Design a protein with these regions (language model features):
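Active-site-adjacent loop and "lid" segments of alpha/beta metabolic enzymes
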Residues: 1-10, 14, 27-112
Length: 112
């Protein structure tokens, strides 16, 4: 993934963009990951490896998934849960619909 974004950052630079965010695109439809448990593990692995993308010199943005299949009626707990994993991986910008919950979680962790 880092190789791909390295090439994209070079292209952006040639087009005049000096700074932006690296966004691996989590939270969107995965046609190749239909099994929700496999998809969620892939997303968590990507969150935990955000620090590798930060080495490219741009901050990392991650969209936090709902994971309805796993969280069911407690779906509003999913994004705060994933925010912990993303924070541990070094995510800089968290895309969330649960701003107060995620903010409280990150403040409690003392990382942001």
């Amino acid at each position: 993934m880092a190789e791909y974004f390295s090439r994209e950052i070079e292209t952006a630079g040639r087009c005049g963009l000096a700074k932006g965010f690296v966004d691996p695109g989590l939270g969107f439809y995965y046609g190749n990951l239909q099994d929700s448990s496999i998809r969620i593990r892939h997303q968590m692995k990507t969150f935990l490896n955000a620090f590798r993308l930060r080495r490219l010199g741009w901050p990392v943005c991650n969209a936090l998934p709902h994971a309805v299949e796993c969280f069911g009626d407690e779906v509003r707990s999913a994004e705060p849960f994933f925010s912990v994993i993303a924070a541990l991986g070094g995510t800089d910008l968290f895309r969330t619909h649960e701003v107060p919950r995620v903010h409280a979680m990150l403040r409690t962790l003392g990382v942001y």
